[in-house]
């Protein structure tokens, strides 16, 4: 019964997520690269973003029943906006803000729950990240797979909305740790060398 409404909501959410990417292109991090990225500052950024995400998620989960359900998509978009800015700030501290693509943003946001979705476009090793060029169709396929993941998340949140206080604690805690995982993924990713497939082919041909 919940699948069809949730699928519709996830489609609307994906449209909102794509709009967020346009906003991220205009976002300029206030942080500048250093010779060695300051570990304390990175941890502070992740911690602050995690608390902010948790607070927003918990607050949006307080209204009970149908009113609370209406707040699910705005909540998700606000949390992903916080996480997206966190990714950009971490990239800036590593001096790699200009290398952030929509593929890398999605990878940081969803790797901990769906690394397999990115198998065709991102290859990660211990020391480097390789980004393969994507067609519109490939990127659309990735979004469709993420849509399934998001639908499951929306269904869980729907149940939580019927238990206002307990549900708020659960969703707030989940958003907190989810943002921490996103931050840790971004720190691990941007500490590596980032290459595109075109660059690799050029180097191999020399």
Model-derived regions, located:
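Terminal, membrane-proximal amphipathic helices
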Residues: 1-62, 81-206
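Selective recognition of hydrophobic, aromatic-rich stretches within alpha-helical transmembrane segments
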Residues: 69-78, 174
């Amino acid at each position: 019964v919940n699948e069809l409404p949730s699928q519709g909501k996830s489609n609307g959410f994906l449209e909102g997520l794509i709009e967020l990417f346009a906003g991220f292109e205009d976002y300029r991090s206030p942080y500048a690269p250093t010779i060695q990225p300051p570990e304390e500052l990175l941890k502070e950024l992740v911690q602050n973003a995690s608390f902010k995400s948790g607070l927003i998620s918990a607050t949006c989960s307080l209204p009970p029943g149908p009113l609370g359900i209406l707040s699910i998509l705005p909540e998700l978009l606000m949390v992903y906006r916080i996480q997206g800015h966190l990714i950009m700030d971490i990239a800036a501290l590593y001096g790699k803000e200009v290398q952030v693509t929509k593929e890398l943003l999605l990878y940081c946001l969803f790797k901990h729950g769906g690394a397999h979705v990115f198998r065709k476009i991102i290859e990660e090793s211990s020391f480097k990240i390789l980004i393969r060029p994507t067609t519109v169709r490939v990127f659309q396929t990735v979004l469709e797979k993420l849509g399934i993941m998001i639908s499951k998340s929306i269904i869980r949140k729907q149940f939580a909305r019927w238990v206002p206080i307990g549900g708020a604690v659960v969703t707030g805690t989940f958003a907190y740790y989810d943002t921490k995982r996103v931050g840790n993924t971004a720190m691990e990713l941007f500490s590596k060398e980032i290459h595109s497939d075109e660059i690799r082919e050029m180097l191999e041909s020399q």
